[in-house]
A protein has these predicted regions:
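Conserved, mostly hydrophobic/aromatic
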Residues: 174, 209, 248
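Aromatic-lined carbohydrate-binding/catalytic grooves of carbohydrate-active enzymes
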Residues: 198-242
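Conserved small/polar residues in nucleotide/adenosyl-binding loops
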Residues: 259-266
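Short proline/glycine-enriched turn/loop motifs at strand-loop junctions of beta-rich domains
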Residues: 67-73
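Short, acidic/polar
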Residues: 187-198
Length: 270
């Protein structure tokens, strides 16, 4: 017999929907148990997976990791190997569905495009890595690919710590691409230079940036997210976004953003 949630007990109007509410609640608990390995780690640990997964520069070169428990083979393909499957770019399967490859420093370079060729029982396909931090769209084919983002002189935040004034918190909702007067897609730099000063002048201390993660359909206002860890390349580079956030903090303005995922295979994560 299912246990009645206090939420339903406290609100009789919810009784007709008790089954659906209880089912959804249990689904959340089951998913949390899966993501936290039954409580052996926290949701914060899971959310920090980008520090471990994805492409990272190391003292010896590069390390790339992906979680793909149902895969049988995975190759990294890109402009660095003419998009061909090479033994040198084949990932090795580790424990718990993790795949990994270590590459020398000259194997890939800043600006290279790449994807994963993933094989599974009965199928195969190209996929953008789940933890890609930079994804760009080809102007001709309109196809999205991950991009290596490792500039020689990456942007360094000038304001190391920041705590906004929340008494009260005055939030200005904005969209980077639609904030300009011109009929075009605005940029991070334009927003920083032209819009932020006006927001500060009006007395706001927080900007809620409408979904800023990479999304294939611009008309979704950014809410068809395909890559959680990649800021939209339509508006500029990761470093230009950092400069925008830095400038906001200098003006006493906090920055928040929220969104949800898009269900699609070829331009989304694994």
């Amino acid at each position: 017999m299912e246990k009645t949630l206090n939420l339903v007990k406290n609100d009789p109007w919810l009784e007709p929907f008790a089954g659906a509410i209880t089912g959804r609640h249990q689904h959340v608990l089951d998913k949390e148990a899966e993501l936290t390995n039954k409580g052996k780690q926290t949701l914060s640990d899971f959310a920090s997976g980008y520090l471990y997964f994805g492409l990272h520069r190391t003292d010896k070169g590069w390390t790339f990791r992906e979680w793909a428990p149902n895969a049988t083979h995975i190759y990294m393909v890109g402009t660095f190997n003419n998009w061909e499957e090479k033994a040198a770019y084949k990932l090795k399967k580790q424990k718990n569905g993790i795949w990994e490859i270590n590459l020398p420093a000259d194997a890939i370079h800043h600006g290279d495009l790449y994807k994963l060729n993933v094989y599974w029982e009965g199928g195969q396909g190209e996929r953008i890595p789940a933890w890609a931090t930079r994804v760009v769209q080809d102007e001709q084919t309109k196809i999205f690919s991950a991009q290596v983002w490792a500039p020689e002189n990456p942007y360094k935040f000038k304001k190391k710590t920041f705590k906004p004034d929340t008494n009260p918190l005055l939030i200005y909702e904005c969209h980077i691409g639609m904030a300009q007067q011109e009929e075009k897609v605005g940029t991070y730099n334009e927003f920083r230079e032209k819009i932020l000063p006006r927001i500060a002048e009006e007395g706001y201390n927080c900007i809620q940036i409408m979904a800023i993660q990479e999304h294939p359909y611009y008309g979704s206002f950014g809410y068809h997210v395909s890559s959680f860890f990649a800021a939209s390349s339509r508006f500029g580079t990761p470093d230009e976004l950092k400069a925008l956030i830095d400038a906001a903090h200098e003006m006493g303005i906090a920055a928040v953003s929220y969104t949800h995922l898009r269900a699609h295979e070829t331009d989304s994560y694994l």
